[in-house]
Amino acid sequence: MSKVITFSEDARTHILKGVNTLANAVKVTLGPKGRNVVIDKSFGSPLITKDGVTVAKEIELENKFENMGAQMVKEVASKTNDEAGDGTTTATVLAQAIYREGAKLVSAGHNPMSIKRGIDKAVGIIIEELKSMSKPVKGSNEVAQVGAISANNDKEIGQMLADAMDKVGREGVITIEESKTAKTEVTVVEGMQFDRGYLSPYFVTNAERMEAVLENAYVLVYDKKISSMKDMIGILEGVAKQGRQLLIIAEDVEGEALATLVVNKLRGTLHIAAVKAPGFGDRRKAMLEDIAILTGAKVISEDVGLKLEAATVADLGVAKRIVVDKDNTTIIDGAGKKNDINGRVGQIKAQIEETSSDYDKEKLKERLAKLAGGVAVIHVGAPSEVEMKEKKHRVEDALNATRAAVEEGIVAGGGTALLRASTKIDKSKFSEEEQFGATIIKRACEEPIRQIAANAGLDGAIVLDRILQNKSTTWGFNAYSDEYTDLIKDGVIDPVKVVRCALTNAASVSSLMLTTETMIAEAPKKESAAPAMPGHDGMGGMGGMM
């Protein structure tokens, strides 16, 4: 396959065109007065969104060289989304500004490698300054403000996230699902819930709700199948003598064992329920261990030399309340020791730090939440499917922003923190060529404010000038109310993690693009002309006709 190669000035021009095309489509969404983008879908109704990364992911350009520039900026948005979950539009605006200013200097003959070193140094200075400006999140009010800003000033969403975080704690898991109604609401699952229901509907105690509810019940945790009743006689007799209730969690309960449990339940001899163990393979073993620690049970497992027939009531755990429906089991207020639970939480946190797999991280965080707090589900509803999808995007952004804020703290929003932090560049020393890179970053840090102002129908230069007249680091422009004010008091705040990731990723990709001198792409395929048909005047086979 033949290739097309382009060099130096031509290459940079192509990259800049691609960068500008993508960034111009994305940056209209920035700020409280940013606009929506409508995206055509190959099936279903068009998607309306104000989420930068969603817009960026849809863009593919026809010209291969320009597309390379666009794809590299798309990488900036995606990486920022993966790390911080928000700030994708800011990252795109910064990447465009850094590359645009840098390309001018490289074209004028400056050394791109020295400019890159200057950019990297300046970014390091700004990040240190952002950390020193950071304020920890205090109380649910600030959590609600962060959520509202990321959800395009939707205070209802912000408050909902703050309430959910209050209920499940900062370690808890908050998930977002589409609602079947037009209402958006939060439901909280207290205690530990796993996705396994009762093995027989005969275990149900509440026929109206189709639930088996056990109060002050023992919990048996076993890692193998239970087929024979004789293995369980000892435990069942011990539980029956005390007149207590019992939940059996095992790989499976089948045949004679299940039939005997059902008969005893129907006769009223035993108040009992049985469910399958959650998860698969190694994850199942870990989750059974979690349940055992939460309830104060021992995992009955031959791996540790415990057999079911030798188990006694002392090996069982206890929970104040257990609710089992056809799909889920919820264990509330287990009797596990606080120290054991904290030790297990610490162990899972260490595993989260060590693992590099996003899937494993997600599953470990779910286990952590079930042990440490609980799970909150936000059901997003709206009158139409199009609006519901747009709202779901905003809720996801808001959730990610609030988590980031809790992690690393907050700074003044509206692009102000970057502008204030960039003033530190003037007080730092750079070599002559590196100074150009530092100047590029200083100029790029003004760009988010300029764009927020432009989207609000104002002149960015005038807004910048007004902000810089006041030396307070929290003083800035509130585009929602069109006022110059103390942004933190007004609740216009950004998570430090979001601002940091946006700048780091934008500078990383843009400075690499500046050092590009050659571009190679596949040559477009030439359309081959259709072969002429045999015969005279293209009418072969018809010569005998008059």
Curated annotation (Swiss-Prot):
Gene3D superfamilies hit by this protein: GroEL, GroEL-like equatorial domain, TCP-1-like chaperonin intermediate domain
Transmembrane regions listed in the UniProt entry: none
Cellular component aspect of the GO annotation: cytoplasm
Biased composition (Gly residues): 537-546
This protein's UniProt keywords: ATP-binding, Chaperone, Cytoplasm, Isomerase, Nucleotide-binding
CDD domains: GroEL (cd03344)
GO biological process: protein refolding
Disordered, as annotated region: 525-546
Entries under InterPro entries matching the protein: Chaperonin_Cpn60_CS (IPR018370), Cpn60/GroEL (IPR001844), Cpn60/GroEL/TCP-1 (IPR002423), GroEL-like_apical_dom_sf (IPR027409), GROEL-like_equatorial_sf (IPR027413), TCP-1-like_intermed_sf (IPR027410)
Main localization (coarse): cytoplasm
Database matches in PROSITE patterns: CHAPERONINS_CPN60
Subunit structure: Forms a cylinder of 14 subunits composed of two heptameric rings stacked back-to-back. Interacts with the co-chaperonin GroES.
Role summary: Together with its co-chaperonin GroES, plays an essential role in assisting protein folding. The GroEL-GroES system forms a nano-cage that allows encapsulation of the non-native substrate proteins and provides a physical environment optimized to promote and accelerate protein folding.
PANTHER family registered for this protein in UniProt: 60 KDA HEAT SHOCK PROTEIN, MITOCHONDRIAL
Identification of the protein by name: Chaperonin GroEL
Lineage: Bacteria, Pseudomonadati, Bdellovibrionota, Bdellovibrionia, Bdellovibrionales
Gene name linked to the record: groEL
